[in-house]
UniProtKB/Swiss-Prot annotation:
Belongs to the DsbB family. The lineage of its organism: Bacteria, Pseudomonadati, Pseudomonadota, Betaproteobacteria, Burkholderiales. It comes from Burkholderia lata (strain ATCC 17760 / DSM 23089 / LMG 22485 / NCIMB 9086 / R18194 / 383). The gene is dsbB1. This is Disulfide bond formation protein B 1. Keywords: Cell inner membrane, Cell membrane, Chaperone, Disulfide bond, Electron transport, Membrane, Oxidoreductase, Redox-active center, Transmembrane, Transmembrane helix, Transport. Residues 1-14, 65-71, 164-170 are cytoplasmic. It holds the Pfam family DsbB. Its main location: membrane. The keyword Cell division does not apply. The keyword tRNA-binding does not apply. GO terms for biological process: protein folding. The chain crosses the membrane at residues 15-31, 50-64, 72-89, 145-163. One of its GO terms (cellular component) is plasma membrane.
């Protein structure tokens, strides 16, 4: 095997791991929603969309054989992860400052009118308020865990893009 083949195989493993991590995080969100009765707010649903996008892009990139296609999809993953970091940070700010609000009355109709909310209402319909603080897991609030997840994904993908930047030219 040459260096190119080894590098692309390593990259595929990373991308498959990212995809499966996103599936696990979404499964955890559904567990909290249906078993623990922790209703998702508009910002929670937006974060779910970002995790879905990251997972889809990761699985697509894992199936591509050329570096340029992988690079484009990894760039899309980085953009989605950055959006997730921003959304989770905003959500965490709202929960840590009791007087703040996510603007439920303006965000909820927008999020609920998106097509996936019509196709999969059990996963993408808003049912809670952003200000509602649920019990922390290991001392960290749910938006904090989401922020950590998005940040780790962003760092991993940006590091991968940086590591393989020369493969695009050659």
């Amino acid at each position: 095997m040459n260096d190119y083949t080894l590098a692309i195989r390593r990259e595929r493993r990373l991308l498959m791991l990212l995809g499966w991590v996103c599936i696990a995080l979404l499964a955890g969100a559904l567990y909290l929603q249906y078993v623990k009765n922790e209703d998702p707010c508009p910002l929670c649903i937006i974060q779910r969309y970002f995790f879905c996008a990251i997972g889809i892009f990761a699985f697509l990139a894992a199936g591509i054989r050329n570096w340029r296609g992988v690079w484009v999809l990894e760039l899309l993953i980085a953009i989605a992860a950055a959006g997730g970091v921003g959304t989770a940070a905003r959500h965490l700010t709202i929960q840590m400052n009791p007087g703040f609000s996510c603007g439920f009355d303006t965000l909820q109709p927008i999020v609920d009118s998106l097509p996936p909310a019509q196709w999969f209402p059990g996963m993408f319909k808003v049912a809670g308020l952003c200000e509602t603080v649920y019990p922390p897991i290991f001392g960290i609030l749910l938006p904090g865990w989401s922020l950590i997840g998005f940040a780790v994904i962003l760092i991993a993908v940006v590091a991968s893009l940086w590591r393989h930047r020369r493969k695009l030219v050659g």
